[in-house]
Amino acid sequence: MHRFDYSKSAQKVMEPEVVSLLMAVQEYKGRVHVREQAAPALLETLREIAKIQSTEASNRIEGIVTTSPRLKALVQQKTTPRNRSEEEIAGYRDVLNTVHENYQYISPLPPYILQMHRDLYAYSGRGGEWKRTDNIISETDARGNRHVRFEPVPAYRTADAMESLCTAFREALQNRVAEPLVLIPLFILDFLCIHPFADGNGRMSRLLTTLLLNRSGYDVGRYISLEHIIDSAKEGYYGSLQASSAGWHENRADYVPFVRYFLGVLIKAYTELELRMNAVGTAKTSKPGRVKALFAQSLGPLKKSDIAEKCPDISLTTIERALHALQGEGYIVRIGKGRATAYVRKDA
């Protein structure tokens, strides 16, 4: 039976690489915090983009999708769900908003976690209770054969396991046995190994990640979608989960791969936020000049959508004019056709 000993688990993960990643996150956080007050309009725009991207990506990871126009309308609450997928998307939107707006009042305790799950499935009425039957985590190989990858905590032990998990985590934070950035991924991995719900465990784990980061003062997920970063590198996400969950029941789990992955996602998010703040921060640089600067900083091709994402305050029309001008100068060339069209620096 697994024991939730965060003092011991935290000590085991403090390898040189993890310490280096922790220091990098702290450094980025400090640099970004100093400049947050200087770009309120940008941050508001980034918040809206992050909401859409987070809702889309976290659901897409689980195979829950809709069209881009429908997704945007759902996130902006300009329409109502038409089917089960859209019900689950709308539920995620609501819980994500609650997490960002009221995180200081939502403790990581079983009653609150159950309420979050209830709201996640508010449009279908299927949430808000621990699993009643055992579940398994399986995978399909190249030949189409399904294999059991991990057997979570059985249903009859789930309530006790969640109580023990939350108590151990709360005590670890109160006693400061380790930095929150170490304790949070330990908690999330344990949550996923318990797999306490019949459905929605992956999405709940990402909502809980955002909640715990916000409560600890690391609110980069407000402006840069952590879910989007995870979705863009799902192989690393699932690989780290598999590596760290091995031997979990026998207290032999190696949390390091998942902690490394978690900190890497945060560094990517802070790096992206700093780049966007830098792009706006240079008042003397024109918008076309900022588009050109993106190509100077990029080693690979950029699509119009990439530029729009990195410079949300620049209109699509301005981006298209800048691209046309840069092609005329011979600074960039166009590659691909149709939706695959991208642009790359000529000397790249």
Language-model-detected regions and their locations in the chain:
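FIC/Doc superfamily catalytic core
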Residues: M1-A348
